[in-house]
Amino acid sequence: MRSLIALGSLLVLIAAACVSPTTTTAPAKEVVVPEQAKLEAAAAQYAPTDIGADISKLPAGEQQALSRLVEAGWVMDGLFLRQVWAGNEGLLLNLLTDRSPLGQARTHYFLLNKGPWDRLDHYTPFFAGVPPKPEGANFYPAGSTKADIEAWMKTLPEAERAQAAGFFTTIRRTANGKAGKPGFEIVPYSVEYQGELTRAADLLREAARLTAQPTLKKFLETRADAFLSNDYYASDVAWMELDASIEPTIGPYEVYEDEWFNAKAAFEAFIAVRDDDETAKLAKLGAELQGIEDNLPIEPALRNPKLGGMAPIRVVNVVLAAGDGNRGVQTTAYNLPNDERVVREKGAKRVMLRNVQEAKFNLVLRPIGARVLTGAQQKNVTFDAFFTHTVMHELMHGLGPHQITVAGKATTVRAQLKDTYSAMEEAKADISGLFALQRLIDKGVLPRSMEESIYDTYLASAFRAIRFGVAEAHGRGIAMQLNFLIDFGAITVGPDGAFAINPAKIKDGVTALTREIMTLQAAGDYAKAKDMLTRLAVVRPEVKKVLDKLTGIPIDIEPRFTRPGL
């Protein structure tokens, strides 16, 4: 068994990055950091755990293909490091020269966060001498402002403006500005990251030659082409059609690092093997979605009578997560791609990371349940309930209002709810996921024995999410739900401060909150959404007391990926 340590791989990637003609790395600075104990305490918020998958049943050729994909995944890791900040690579090289215990503590926490800012503490720098985290990351020129970029984009012809705002381009400074104003140019990722993407494309083509699975071969070949052409459409379609024992997600996807425009995609990789048994189990949940939509607790006119074809759901066990897929708090599931053309034609694939979820449950959620819930309800916190609710959360993102009409004009919930959208949508998926699971239990699709566990596990998981902070969408959404259900009487707080589900009111409370969120979404009611979040997305004293009891329980996991047999 070999352990994949990010440190060694990043050294290789950084060395390779130095040959890229478009790389701009800030000069290394003298680093002054907090004491070793403080850094180690910060790192202890993440519980180290081995993450791997059984690949013994894969034929030799598939195992070799998987090994090439892992190598390509590490290329994404190095690219993401550069995308976060132009100074990241120089700073890391500086850190690596110090092999003392203090130096290793510095490097460790840097790699956990993919930079010198604490992702659990509102991006507070944990090194002296570094700037605040750039909101535009390294997608835009250092020293430019959001207003500079917006003003420049307004001068562009429509086609160029679309490229400038696209997922797969950076904006760089040029000497061609006019009247003393800054000049900018559009640089495709295929040029900006040419050296690394050429290497990644070569590895994908090697993997394509090794696999005997046609849909995997097609995805790898088209994604290799995309790395060099900057056109990802065909490979996104091939990824949606992928039906293979190996499930790779690799390339530029999520846009969270671009805090200016949420436009630029960050490189990530999830290299995984499919869990066929668990994937088959989920198929029956997907088959129930139209029935759930038809019975949502909203006015019938607000329901979608035709959801369309069922998008793929995959349950996988991760072999490697890298880049944007492995920084700070780990994701447990994702919906991709983000290209609206592909989503219109093919939908979005939901991928559930089962081994990551199981690690979080054992190391974080179960211990939280033991401190938060009453003794009688602690035994009901189960991985099966946690996993099933996570699945239903992802599925419920696709149900309820999306395309709406406001003041006679067609629009979207996202556009109308603006800055409240993410928190309200996460809350909707959570609470309506409980509503949907109860319906499936009542219908006999899921066993009646799951009824208590879904609510008690949800309550324990609420405290897990609030620990991420109410400035983050998931944390705001769960705080709003928790306080609503407490006010409704569906969740009670005992004299000892322990929380409990009230069986007599929880179902009605879940239904009421599902109705309230979906109704305001259908109306595009920004004022009501803002009011709900202002009133309810807060940490009340009784919740704060419980959070204070969770000292010593990790906030999340630090995966250490293992590859037996590779």
What residue ranges belong to the model's regions?
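N-terminal helix-rich structural modules
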Residues: A28-T211, T215-F219
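Active-site recognition of the HExxH zinc-binding catalytic motif
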Residues: T388-H402, A429, L434
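Contiguous, non-catalytic segments that form substrate-binding/exosite surfaces or channel walls
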Residues: Y189-Q378, T382
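Bacterial signal peptide processing site
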Residues: V19-P21
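C-terminal motif of bacterial Sec signal peptides marking the signal peptidase cleavage site
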Residues: I14-A17
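Post-HEXXH active-site segment of zinc metalloproteases
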Residues: P401-A427
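An active-site-proximal "capping" alpha-helix that borders the catalytic cofactor pocket
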Residues: Q213, S422-R439
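Long, well-structured alpha-helical subdomains associated
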Residues: L434-D531
